[in-house]
Amino acid sequence: MKVGIIGAGTMGAGIAQAFAQTEGFTVALCDINNEFAANGKNKIAKGFEKRIAKGKMEQAEADAILGRITTGTKEICADCDLIIEAAIENMEIKKQTFKELDDICKPEAIFATNTSSLSITEIGAGLKRPMIGMHFFNPAPVMKLVEIIAGLNTPTDIVDKIKKVSEDIGKVPVQVEEAPGFVVNKILIPMINEAIGIYAEGIASVEGIDTAMKLGANHPIGPLALGDLIGLDVCLAIMDVLYHETGDSKYRAHTLLRKMVRGKQLGQKTGKGFYDYTK
């Protein structure tokens, strides 16, 4: 099966790796230009270099995986069997991307979006084929869960096919109903937002909050470190979707979160968030 990944950022590159490291899959990793797409593949290669240096991976295995990934713009997705969009969490960008792909891809290609919170039905509205949600978690090559979300017009056979594909690459698919944030992010992101509020109120330090949740709630990573890993811009986007879709004030993003995003302190991806990653 040939899989087209649209968006070669953190999630797109991770999803590409998850497929390419499984025999039987080839990947077309795409972005708005060739350089961005190549950067995504290079990110995967650099991760492999670290694993090889630690003796956790053989060079031949890395070469085989990278050999299954081609890069370019969306035009190289014309013959793909499955398209997974992993672009920025913006409804209009996603809709426009799929509108263009609808004319490029073969009729039998399945369209899936990796959106973490947006409406599957709305993303797929007006397309010549159905849409399905296939939500991976960061880091995509490692995290086992894939949330499978059917839109209003998603046929059962498409749902079954995507579940099978998820299992084929070693993931555990969980079907959830279409709702803002689905399951994981509807629980997780407000928790991170609450942790930001606790820090802003001076109740505990960043390290104190994360240590408390790791030792007191048995979380493998603290909420503020997790926010940095996810990307504070992504956290804000999800909070805004939850708030606008539900109108419930409990989903209102904390002002500190918004301020940090405006200041480009997004976490690991920019080198600084609640922790400093430049040291």
Give the role of each language-model region.
Residues 1-50, 54:
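NAD(P)+-binding Rossmann beta1-loop-alpha1 motif at the extreme N-terminus of oxidoreductases
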Residues 12-15, 94, 116-120:
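Short glycine/serine/threonine-rich phosphate/pyrophosphate-binding segments
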Residues 23-24, 156, 167-178, 200-201, ...:
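NAD(P)-dependent Rossmann-like dehydrogenase/reductase catalytic/cofactor-binding core
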Residues 25, 139-149, 220-221, 240:
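Acidic/polar active-site rim loop that often engages polyanionic ligands
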Residues 28, 70-72, 84, 132, ...:
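Hydrophobic/aromatic beta-strand patches that form the interior of the parallel beta-sheet core
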Residues 36, 50-110, 118:
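Rossmann-like NAD(P)-binding element
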Residues 110-177, 182-185:
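Rossmann-fold dinucleotide-binding core
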